[in-house]
Design a protein with these regions (language model features):
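Extended, charged helical/alpha-beta scaffold domains that provide interaction surfaces
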Residues: 1-195
């Protein structure tokens, strides 16, 4: 039975190590970063401008604060403009603006390859930090899951379900931390003076 608990962590470890391998092999992470940006914008739009609520009830201020915290360069339309769109239109517009903001960030670098290297370093650091936290969290979950047994629930099923949710939260946190860091990087230009 302990092997089945270990199997859950092994599956998650394989996913994380594969991602680390891609980074360490020097693959361009550009598409990965763009996916992280668009997924983050989608998640925030779903959270603050739900299709289940009328546009007048959308929390545009909350959406703006959360997007701006991670992507400071992303400008939202006015609340009135946001509420005049469908959620799909708003999402599309914000994803376009998020991607454009990153293209502008890329243009701040003298060479695109410099940003590619920064992306790899940032992604690796964030993955490693979040993965270490996740290992600790999964260990605590495993220790605490035995208490679930009295509730006529299968502890292994509970561990798998909760562990899967926690893994999803970790991958979302990796994406959010990565793009936040990349959008907040300041590029310093060396100025050569003529003598």
């Amino acid at each position: 039975n302990l092997l089945e608990y270990d199997q859950v962590m092994n599956e998650q470890r394989e996913i994380i190590y594969e991602e680390r391998r891609r980074v360490l092999d020097g693959e361009s992470m550009r598409d990965t970063i763009y996916s992280m940006i668009t997924e983050y914008v989608e998640n925030m739009t779903d959270r603050f401008a739900s299709t289940e609520a009328d546009p007048e009830e959308w929390d545009i201020k909350g959406l703006d604060v959360n997007l701006h915290n991670v992507i400071p360069q992303l400008q939202l339309p006015s609340e009135k403009e946001c509420q005049s769109m469908s959620q799909k239109e708003l999402k599309h517009l914000l994803k376009e603006r998020g991607v454009k903001a990153y293209e502008n960030k890329e243009a701040e670098f003298p060479e695109a390859e410099q940003l590619r290297e920064v992306e790899r370093v940032v992604l690796l650091k964030v993955i490693d930090a979040r993965w270490m936290d996740h290992i600790d969290d999964m260990d605590q979950l495993r220790q605490g899951i035995g208490l679930q047994a009295y509730g006529q629930r299968d502890p292994l099923v509970e561990y798998k379900m909760t562990g899967y949710e926690m893994f999803g939260e970790m991958t979302n946190a990796i994406a959010e931390n990565t793009i936040r860091t990349l959008f907040h990087i300041k590029v310093e230009q060396k100025v050569e003076r003529e003598e």
